[in-house]
């Protein structure tokens, strides 16, 4: 299975079987910032944004004072799981980032998708990749 298939079928899937309800954007990105696969809607990010995200996984709380930036959009960092998941919020939408051994799994959402639905989609794929040694 290609990385793009993981994004298309496992991240950009229908949410809870509701046609037309899906994440706004998704991607799988290597720890070094290389794009493994992404949806056509995933924002063009800056290398320093990925560096900041990786630093927050190593030093939880690093992004809290400044916010999490992705494609120039600022998200307020909300509760996550140290070393495993970062969650950000902006208005009615947000982002969930799951760290695996080699990659970062991103899900970006907006209403009507809820934070919990995005978390479930992103973390389920991230956990699967971790089980596969990725």
From Swiss-Prot:
It is found in: Cytoplasm, Cytoskeleton. One of its GO terms (cellular component) is cytoskeleton. PROSITE patterns: PROFILIN. Occurs in many kinds of cells as a complex with monomeric actin in a 1:1 ratio. InterPro entries: PFN, PFN_euk, PFN_sf, Profilin_CS. This is Profilin. PANTHER family: PROFILIN, PROFILIN-5. Belongs to the profilin family. Keywords: Actin-binding, Allergen, Cytoplasm, Cytoskeleton. Pfam families: Profilin (PF00235). Binds to actin and affects the structure of the cytoskeleton. At high concentrations, profilin prevents the polymerization of actin, whereas it enhances it at low concentrations. By binding to PIP2, it inhibits the formation of IP3 and DG.
């Amino acid at each position: 299975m290609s990385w793009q298939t993981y994004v298309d079928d496992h991240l950009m899937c229908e949410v809870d079987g509701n046609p037309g309800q899906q994440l706004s954007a998704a991607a799988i990105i290597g720890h070094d910032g290389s794009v493994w696969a992404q949806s056509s809607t995933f924002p063009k990010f800056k290398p320093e944004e990925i560096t900041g995200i990786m630093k927050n996984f190593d030093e939880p709380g690093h992004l809290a004072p400044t916010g999490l930036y992705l494609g120039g959009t600022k998200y307020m960092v909300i509760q996550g799981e140290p070393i495993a998941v970062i969650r950000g919020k902006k208005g009615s939408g947000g982002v969930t980032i799951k760290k695996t051994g080699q990659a970062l799994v991103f899900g970006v959402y907006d209403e009507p998708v809820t934070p919990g639905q995005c978390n479930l989609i992103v973390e389920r794929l991230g956990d699967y990749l971790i089980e596969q040694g990725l």
